[in-house]
Amino acid sequence: MAVEKINASSSLAEVVDRILDKGVVVDAWVRVSLVGIELLAVEARVVVAGVDTYLKYAEAVGLTASAQAA
């Protein structure tokens, strides 16, 4: 069985379109401590999505006003 390598290259526009269509969530949590004393804590959640994608997600989890009224 031969291994076939496919060079599928995507343009930047295609990558951005896919990210906005599907959405990306980055959830980060960092804690820096020294000798048991917490010096710095950072918690971040970054969501990158198109408006349509966000509204579908928000309605599904009950974040929109129309979902809360129902």
From Swiss-Prot:
The keyword Oxidoreductase does not apply. Keywords: Gas vesicle. Coiled coil: none annotated. It is found in: Gas vesicle shell. Its main location: other. One of its GO terms (cellular component) is gas vesicle shell. It comes from the Bacteria. It holds the Pfam family Gas_vesicle. The keyword Membrane does not apply. During exponential growth cells contain about 75 gas vesicles measuring 250 x 100 nm. Gas vesicles are cylindrical with conic ends. They collapse by centrifugation (12000 x g for 10 minutes at 4 degrees Celsius); upon resuspension small biconical gas vesicles start to form within 5 minutes. They grow until they are 100 x 100 nm when they start to elongate. The gas vesicle shell is 2 nm thick and consists of a single layer of this protein. It forms helical ribs nearly perpendicular to the long axis of the vesicle. This is Gas vesicle protein A.
